[in-house]
Regions:
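Short, small-residue-biased leader/transition segments that mark boundaries at the very start
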Residues: 1-3, 7-9
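Multi-pass alpha-helical transporter architecture, strongest
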Residues: 12-18, 203-218
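Juxtamembrane intracellular "pre-TM" segments in multi-pass secondary transporters
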Residues: 22-48
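Extracytoplasmic gate region of multi-pass secondary transporters
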Residues: 38-86, 93-96
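Helix-to-loop junctions at the C-terminal end of transmembrane segments
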Residues: 95-108, 190-191
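Structural signature of the two symmetry-related core transmembrane helices
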Residues: 110-125
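Intracellular juxtamembrane helix-capping segments at the cytosolic ends
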Residues: 147-162
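A late C-terminal transmembrane helix in Major Facilitator Superfamily
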Residues: 160-195
């Protein structure tokens, strides 16, 4: 699917721009799949892995759900409602760009909390708003809020186990693809109660990220 490659590409580009990397000579053998999965036994690494899954779930979910919300509540055509996806990526891209500068001046934990609060407010807004402009504001907030979640979680995981950089990075990348399970749950929820059900699934992901905020080091 095109969206999966877009999600991975944008996150990896953001990571490379936002993270300072000191190259060191490679030592030992390349990490195996089993060695990466074994790190899930470490509580913080598991929390980080789940956090990245939530990030991807929110990202993919917003792209698929936002246009449907406009169509369901405002009777817009698919062509017109498709602007919601573009709006999301505009603010996500802007957030990626600004985040690289903000993280130089602000603690990662503080910025992560602000980002999650933006998404939390937006999710509640998507439950209640029927106005086109306000729905667009919510979509923009999700785009900005979700733009720096991946690099912050990734860096926190790397700092937690600096001696296992290869394994940790491999596991976090796996989380990008693991997050694709969210659309399945969202599809079931939307079939049952409409697009508000899909928003509820994304809200669970945002609430988890709120919980993860307290585990981030300053």
């Amino acid at each position: 699917c095109d969206w999966s490659s877009d999600v991975c590409s944008s996150d990896l580009i953001l990571l490379l721009n936002a993270t300072q990397i000191t190259e060191e000579p490679e030592e030992g053998k390349p990490s195996t799949f089993g060695q990466c999965l074994a790190l899930l036994g470490k509580p913080f690494i598991l929390l980080s892995f789940l956090g990245i899954m939530c990030h991807v779930g929110i990202d993919v979910g917003t792209n698929t759900t936002a246009p449907k919300i406009l169509m369901e509540r405002l009777g817009m055509t698919l062509a017109d409602a498709g602007f919601a996806t573009s709006l999301y990526f505009i603010f996500r891209t802007a957030g990626c760009f600004l985040g690289a500068f903000i993280l130089q001046k602000m603690a990662a934990k503080t910025f992560f909390a602000i980002s999650v609060l933006c998404m939390l407010a937006a999710m509640f807004g998507l439950f209640v708003f029927q106005d086109q402009a306000m729905i667009y504001v919510c979509i923009a907030l999700i785009g900005f809020g979700n733009s720096n979640v991946f690099p912050i979680i990734f860096s926190q995981a790397m700092l937690y186990m600096p001696d296992k950089k290869n394994e940790v990075s491999g596991l976090m990348i796996m989380g990008l693809f693991g997050g694709t399970i969210f659309p399945l749950a969202m599809g079931v929820a939307s079939d049952a109660v409409g697009q508000s059900g899909a928003v509820a699934v994304m809200l669970v992901g945002v609430l988890y990220l709120m919980f993860y905020t307290w585990r981030i080091k300053k």
